[in-house]
From Swiss-Prot:
It comes from the Archaea. GO terms for cellular component: cytosolic large ribosomal subunit. One of its GO terms (molecular function) is structural constituent of ribosome. Part of the 50S ribosomal subunit. The keyword Ribonucleoprotein applies. The keyword Cell membrane does not apply. This is Large ribosomal subunit protein uL15. Pfam families: Ribosomal_L27A (PF00828).
Length: 151
């Protein structure tokens, strides 16, 4: 003999446990449709769960002041410099490769990786570590601005 009902789906019950017909219809039971009422009747919810919902927070720098760095590290540059030369994106000056990184779409040279080739690099921004690694192989970096680590 079955002790529990086969289904708990309120078969034959018109309102399925929601009382009168209108009590589970449309948005009245939720206090409005969508993101409504957070500064009115749902204020206690806002205070508890979304305290930063209203007001200004922080600031946005003017786009002209924000520089988006497209970086390449010296290891990547060293690995690809011969390919750049084959494609005509770099030239030779004696035994050194000459690369203008702005023409390749980069505006910053960072110091990660190893340098095996002698490279002369033209770039707007370079880290001191990148400059020292390039110069250790007899190359040089023609740079507008140097950066400390973490800048």
């Amino acid at each position: 003999m079955r002790r529990e009902k086969k289904s708990r789906a309120y078969r034959g019950s018109r309102t399925h446990g929601w009382g009168r017909v209108g009590q589970h219809r449309k948005s009245g039971s939720r206090g409005g449709r969508g993101l409504v009422g957070y500064h009115k009747h749902k204020w206690s919810w806002t205070v508890k769960y979304a305290p930063d919902w209203y007001g200004k927070h922080g600031f946005t720098r003017h786009p002209s002041l924000v520089v988006e760095y497209r970086t390449i590290n010296v290891g990547q540059l060293d690995a690809e410099v011969e390919e750049f030369f084959r494609k005509g994106l770099a030239s030779r000056e004696g035994d050194a490769y000459v690369v203008d990184l702005t023409q390749l779409g980069f505006n910053k040279l960072t110091g990660s990786g190893q340098v095996r080739n002698k490279i002369i690099v033209k770039v707007p921004v370079a880290t001191k570590r990148a400059i020292s690694k390039i110069e250790a192989q007899g190359g040089r970096v023609e740079v507008a601005k140097t950066q400390e680590a973490g800048e």
